[in-house]
Amino acid sequence: MLKGKTVVLGVTGSIAAYKIANLASMLVKKHADVHVIMTENATNFINPITFETLTGNKCLVDTFDRNFQFNVEHVALAKRADVFMVAPASANIIGKIAGGIADDMLSTTIMPAKCPKIIAPAMNTGMIENPIVQDNIKKLESYGYEIVESATGYLACGDTGKGKLPDAEVLQDYILKAIAKEKDMAGVRLLVTAGPTREAIDPVRYITNHSTGKMGYAIARQAMLRGADVTLVTGKVEIEPPIFVNVVDITSAQDMYEAVMDRSTEQDVIIKAAAVADYRPAEVAEHKIKKADGDMSIKLSRTKDILLALGNQRIEKGIQDQIICGFSMETRDLIENSRKKIDSKHIDLIAANNLKVAGAGFGVDTNVLTLITRDSISELPMMSKEECADMLLDRIMEMRKAADLS
C-alpha cells in the first residue's frame, strides 16, 4: 500500500515514544521507507537502535553528526518525505515549529518540508490545556498542519484526562489518509450502511443475524482513504469505525430506514451493505416473556424496504446524479435474482455473493463478489474485504464517469 512512499517520523521526549516503535513496524510492513528523527530528550525514553533495527535506516538525532551523507542530511530528507509526522509531539517542539525556531535535527528537517505534516500532541492535561500551547496548536493548523486529537485516559503522571497519545493504529490511519491512495473520490458524498439490525421481542431478546459489519466498514474506510466525504450508518458491531468518517449508530431496521432516508438526497453514492431484518415482531412485549410449557409463536410484520424506498425516491424527486448500490446474499440463482432486484428496486448496481462459496459471507476477512448491473457482470476472485471495497468503488467511479457525474 505504501510502496515507494517515504514516511518521516519525528519523536520527542515523552513516555509515549514507545508507541512509535510499533507504528514504524506497521508502516514498514506496508512497504514504506520509514525514517526516524529523534530529539535528544527522546533518546532517554527509547534507544535509536530500536528504530534503526525496525526501519533499516539510520536514526537521526545530532544535527552535526560526522557520519552524514554528501547531501545536507536534514534538507535531503525533507525533500524526499511524502508525509512527516511528529509523534509524540511535546509542548516544546510544537512551540518551536509555531515560532519558526530550528535548532535541532527534527526542527530543522520539518521546517523546509513541503509534504503533508501531521502533529500528534502528547503531554500532561495541564500542559495541553495551557492557552499558550493551544494558541501554538491553532497556529500550526492555520499553516496547514494536521493535528491529531489527543486521547483521554490515564496519563503517566498519574492524572486522568486529555493529553494521551492515540494508539499506533490511529496514527497510521492519519498517515494512510494523507498518502496511501489517490484522492479520486475527493468531493464525492458517500453513504454506506453496515452491520446487522436488532428487532426487539421483549426487553431481553431480539431477532438479528450474523453480520459483523466488516464489508461495510471496509467500504467506508477505503472511500475515506480515497478522499470521499463518508457517512457510515451502522448497526451494533464489535469493530471500531474508521476515523474521518461520520458515524450514525442505529439499532433497528426502522432506525436505519430513518437515518438513511433523512440523509439520502444529499448523497452522490449510496451503498447499502447492511444486513437489515426483513421482518420484526408485530408487538414488543413490555416485560420479559416468561418460559412456559409448549411452543410459542411470534407474529412478524414486514420492515420497510430501504433499497426500494431509495430507488423510488430517486424517480419521484428526479434525482439524476446519484448512484445506488445494493448488496445481495444468495444461495442460488445469484445473477438472475440480483438482476430482478436491480429492476424492481430501480437501482444501478448489485454486489452479490453466495453464502455457500468458501471465503464469502459473514464473519470472515475475505469475500467473493459478483458486481452486476443491467448490462454487465464482473466476477471477482476471493480477496480481502478491503480489496473488494476498492474494486466496488472503482466500478462505481467508472459508472459516475460514464454518466458524466465525476
PLM feature segments, named:
Residues 1-118, 124-213, 217-406:
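A cross-family phosphate/adenosyl-ligand binding-site feature
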